[in-house]
Structure formats: structure tokens, C-alpha cells
UniProtKB/Swiss-Prot annotation:
Cofactor: NAD(+)
Main location: cytoplasm
Binding of NAD(+), residues: 53-54, 131, 177-179, 197, 202, 243-244, 264-268, 274-275, 323, 493
Official protein name in the record: Urocanate hydratase
Note accompanying the cofactor annotation: Binds 1 NAD(+) per subunit.
Protein's gene: hutU
Pathway the protein contributes to: Amino-acid degradation; L-histidine degradation into L-glutamate; N-formimidoyl-L-glutamate from L-histidine: step 2/3
EC number in record: 4.2.1.49
Disulfides per UniProt: none
Active-site positions on this chain: 411
Location relative to the cell: Cytoplasm
The reaction(s) this protein catalyses: 4-imidazolone-5-propanoate = trans-urocanate + H2O
GO MF, one example: urocanate hydratase activity
Pfam family, one: Urocanase_C
Length: 559
């Protein structure tokens, strides 16, 4: 028996156009989106099936990938494929309105939900880390997080700088699949940014895709550029090759004062995602194989240094926040008792949006034709005519965001508007205005689909941060509503033991049956976010539930 392989020297790209390689668009769509996740324009390390986020994979190994592709090509529209941690394990007869694929990734019984146990299973070929959209086949490159990061920076600017980030600069680190959105998001928000990254290949990737503008030669050069650009009121992003655990303390020592500090290194995974200070990347990867415990310890010690520097900036009055990579938790475990003194980005800036079911709604053109996305952009503006902020986002996205793989768009909208847009897109497919079907999905980072006490559900006002019934209910409801594929994951964003979350994708193929499914899914999915926050007592969510006519028996029911 051959050993399953996680490496293959191959380039994968999703088919384009209207010729089907599967039996229908309901199975062609997950096939193309799986392949798109591994497109070299999209994935961080596609030859090892890694899409983003440390070791977030699209399939468990290449043999599993091959079998998933073969199965999707043969799957009928009354069958459902079950995928267990990146491995196709069964096909069962269901019905036409059931999901075509159901996915469960990285889920462990809570007592065993640790990186140590997961890594043992991974080494034996028994598990796969799916991150959020890697193993659920709806990653669209760094664009997928750009708007969320942009909204965060804009809201921070409103709270701390009277809504004007001109002449200001953001200090951060990490230019991977998620962190790579930061420089462009800061630029779009009107600020300069200094973005520290320890791998030159990642800087090169972001320079090619125009997510970062320039690379500095060294720290002195970077600071000189920041000083010049902020004085000129320009919003320019600068990458700097280096280690944040070395550079941030040096900035504190020099008395440098940024206007905002955050971080998006892959601190959630100390074995694979955070380079210890003083180490080369090659040493880090080699020692991860030979002495993983020592590597984890060294990485977490460096995170403690990194967080202490962030705390020092906060103590100077600099707005400082965690951007959801669990670095505060790692530092706390290394003795930084006050690591949580600076907040996470969700309670600080994003939760009011979640209360209204607003989150990272995204869609991709299965045709591969950018014009299909531009036509949907215009349709969004037509259907939401009075939202100047949203229109500005769409204009900036078209001008500045390079498509990676299949053309796609991210657009934060909430309950009511998601269904309205989805039905309009389906009608555009029906009439031929769009050249092929559209898929609509979202990040698992959404209002009703995640339990993550150090990120999305941090500091819930009723103390329900760790209650994970909500993403389970979300996945169950999306399955019952007829999403095309539904996923339920553990550990995304913040690592093993710290989150559970669910995702959905639905196909707009122009049919009447699709319209019925779209209306259900794109109402019920954000509806669970409003429900979750209303249940926690947020008045904004309670008001939204009443306005939208949600039936919440303990809250909105008439007595």
C-alpha cells in the first residue's frame, strides 16, 4: 500500500466557460471551487494542498483530492457526498433540494481538541486542518478578508481619529493569505501601513497582486518612507522583511509611535505558522519535524515578546487590537498575564454589524469571465442605491483588487439584502445576462456561524462566548434550507480548541428551484446571526429581528 502524498508538483486551475465536466452545475460548482482553492494565484502552497492559514488544506492528501474530483464528476442531483476532514467517505441517496456535499473538518471531542492530539492524527493521515474556507472550498484569495479589514480600520478611524486616517499609519505583521489583505485595506481606508513579514516569497506574492505597494530595504528605510508619506498625506503600504518579535520591541525602544497597531501572523499555529525570533525559516521547518515541542515553546516565547511590545504601544495611548489570530492566548500561556488588556477587533469595531446579520457575503463567477463580476457589481449598486459607503467599496474594489483565480467579489451585507441580491443574480443567469452560474458563499467569520471566545464571540454581553450550539444550528439550518454545500469545522482562525464554525455555499443556476433555495438559505443564514445576538441581549439585534419579522419565540413572539 502506497503512503498517501501531501506533495505533488502540479498546477491546478478550475475549468472556465459553460462546458460541464460534472453532471450538473450543482456538482460542477463545488468541483470548480475546490480546484480554484488550489489555483497557484489563490493558494499559499498549492503543491502541498495548503490554501492559507498555516496548514489550512483543501483536501487531506492528493489521493483524497483525486477521489473527490472523480466522485463529484459522477455525482447525481439526488445524491450527497460526505467529506470527513478532507477525505471523501460516502455518497448517499438524498433528494434534489439537499446539499450535494456535506463537509466536516478538524472536529475533535473537546477534551482532545489540542494541537498536540491533532498533529498526531494529522501525522497518521487521520485528520486535516480545514481552517475556515480552505477545507470548505470557498476561499477567493486575500480579497475575502479585505473588506472586513477595511471596515475594521475605517471604524477604528471613526472612533479614534474623527473618521480621518489621512497622515496616519498602521503597524502590523503577517502577509499570508489573511494578513495579506491588511496593506490594501489600510490604503483603501486612507492610511499608510508598515507590514512586517518573515518570508520574502509572501512579500513577492503581495507585490505581484498589488496588495502591497513597496518593500523597504530595512527598518530605517521603512520608517523614513512612513515619515515621508504620512507628511504628504499619501496612503502607501510598505512591506518589511523581518520578524515582528524583533522589530516591534525595537520600535518601542526607539520611541516610534504608530497610529494603530494590530497583527495577523499565523500565531494560532505555533508549530507551523509563527517563526521564533532569531531563527531562519528553514531551521523552523526542519526542527518542526525533529523537535516539535521545542519549536512550539520557542514560537510562543517570541509571541510573548511580540505581545508585550503591543501592550507597550497600548500603554502609550496607541489604539491596539488583536485581529483574531489568538496571539494574546499564546502569550498568556507564556506568562503575559495582561495579554488580554487590548481588545479583539470584533467587540471593538465589528459587533454592531453582526447584530444586523451583516458580514462577509461573497460570490464567484464560474464562467471565469471578469465581466460577470462587473455586471453583478452594477446590480448591487442598482438594488442598494442609497448606501454610499457600499458603493465606494465596490468602486475601490474594482480599481484596486486583482482577481485571484476565478473572478469573485466580497461585499458586506446583511439580513434581507443577501436574499435580494442572490435572487437578482439567479435571474441574471436565467436571462443570459451572466454567461454562467454564480456561487454565493461567505467566510465562516460571520454573525451566526461561529463560536470563538477569543475572536468573533469575545466579550459577549451575556457571557455566552464559548457556547457553540450556534454554529451547529447554523449548519443544520443551512442543510435543511437547501444550500449546495455545507461545512462544519473546528479550530479555524484561532487554532485547536478555540473555535467551532460553519459555512455554506449556494449555486445560482438560473432555475426556479434554485430561486427557492436561494430565498431560504440567504434569509435563514444571516437570520441565525441576528437570532444569536438577539438571544445574547443586544438591542440592535432585537430591533433588527422585529423589523425583519424573525420568529424568535423568547423574544419576538406575540403574547
Amino acid at each position: 500500500m502506497t503512503t498517501p502524498s501531501k506533495f505533488r508538483d502540479i498546477e491546478i486551475r478550475a475549468p472556465r466557460g459553460t462546458t460541464l465536466t460534472a453532471k450538473s452545475w450543482l456538482t460542477e460548482a463545488p468541483l470548480r471551487m475546490l480546484m480554484n482553492n488550489l489555483d497557484p494565484e489563490v493558494a499559499e502552497n498549492p503543491r502541498e494542498l495548503v490554501v492559507y492559514g498555516g496548514i489550512g488544506r483543501a483536501a487531506r492528501n492528493w489521493e483524497c483530492y483525486d477521489r473527490i474530483v472523480e466522485t463529484l464528476k459522477q455525482l447525481n442531483d439526488d445524491e450527497t457526498l460526505l467529506v470527513q476532514s478532507g477525505k471523501p467517505v460516502g455518497v448517499f441517496k438524498t433528494h434534489a433540494n439537499a446539499p450535494r456535499v456535506l463537509i466536516a473538518n478538524s472536529n475533535l471531542v473537546p477534551h482532545w481538541a489540542t494541537w498536540e492530539h491533532f498533529n498526531e492524527l494529522d501525522a497518521k493521515g487521520l485528520a486535516m486542518y480545514g481552517q475556515m474556507t480552505a477545507g470548505s472550498w470557498i476561499y477567493i484569495g486575500s480579497q475575502g478578508i479585505v473588506q472586513g479589514t477595511y471596515e475594521t480600520f475605517v471604524e477604528a478611524g471613526r472612533q479614534h481619529y474623527d473618521g480621518n486616517l489621512k497622515g496616519r499609519w498602521v503597524l502590523t505583521a503577517g502577509l499570508g493569505g489573511m494578513g495579506g489583505a491588511q496593506p490594501l485595506a489600510a490604503t483603501l481606508a486612507g492610511a499608510c501601513s508598515l507590514n512586517i513579514e518573515c518570508q520574502q516569497s509572501r512579500i513577492d506574492f503581495r507585490l505581484r497582486s498589488r496588495y502591497v505597494d513597496e518593500q523597504a530595504k530595512d527598518l530605517d528605510d521603512a520608517l523614513a518612507r512612513i515619515q515621508r508619506y504620512t507628511a504628504e498625506g499619501k496612503a502607501i503600504s510598505i512591506a518589511l522583511l523581518g520578524n515582528a518579535a524583533e522589530i516591534l520591541p525595537e520600535l518601542v525602544r526607539r520611541g516610534v509611535r504608530p497610529d494603530m497597531v494590530t497583527d495577523q501572523t499565523s500565531a494560532h499555529d505555533p508549530l507551523n505558522g509563527y517563526l521564533p525570533a532569531g531563527w531562519s525559516w528553514e531551521e523552523y521547518r526542519d526542527r518542526a519535524q525533529t523537535d516539535p515541542a521545542a519549536v512550539v515553546k520557542a514560537a510562543k516565547q517570541s509571541m510573548a515578546v511580540h505581545v508585550r511590545a503591543m501592550l507597550a504601544f497600548q500603554q502609550q495611548g496607541v489604539p491596539t487590537f488583536d485581529y483574531g489570530n489568538n496571539i494574546r492566548q499564546m502569550a498568556k500561556e507564556e506568562g503575559v498575564a495582561n495579554a488580554f488588556d487590548f481588545p479583539g477587533f470584533v467587540p471593538a469595531y465589528i459587533r454592531p454589524l453582526f447584530c444586523r446579520g451583516i458580514g462577509p457575503f461573497r460570490w464567484a463567477a464560474l464562467s471565469g469571465d471578469p465581466q460577470d463580476i462587473y455586471k453583478t457589481d452594477a446590480k448591487v449598486k442598482q438594488l442598494i442605491p442609497d448606501d454610499a459607503h457600499l458603493h465606494r467599496w465596490l468602486d475601490m474594489a474594482r480599481e484596486r483588487i486583482s482577481f485571484q483565480g476565478l473572478p469573485a467579489r466580497i461585499c458586506w451585507v446583511g439580513l434581507g439584502l443577501r436574499a435580494k441580491l442572490g435572487l437578482a443574480f439567479n435571474e441574471m443567469v436565467r436571462t443570459g445576462e451572466l454567461s454562467a452560474p454564480i456561487v454565493i458563499g461567505r467566510d465562516h467569520l460571520d454573525s451566526g456561524s461561529v463560536a470563538s471566545p477569543n475572536r468573533e464571540t469575545e466579550a459577549m454581553q451575556d457571557g455566552s462566548d464559548a457556547v457553540s450550539d450556534w454554529p451547529l444550528l447554523n449548519a443544520l439550518l443551512n442543510t435543511a434550507s437547501g444550500a449546495t454545500w455545507v461545512s462544519l469545522h473546528h479550530g479555524g482562525g484561532v487554532g485547536m480548541g478555540f473555535s467551532q464554525h460553519s459555512g455554506m455555499v449556494i449555486v445560482c443556476d438560473g432555475s426556479d428551484e434554485a430561486a427557492e433555495r436561494i430565498a431560504r438559505v440567504l434569509t435563514n443564514d444571516p437570520g441565525t446571526g441576528v437570532m444569536r445576538h438577539a438571544d445574547a441581549g443586544y438591542q440592535v439585534a432585537i430591533d433588527c429581528a422585529k423589523e425583519q419579522g424573525l420568529n424568535l419565540p423568547m423574544i419576538t413572539a406575540q403574547r
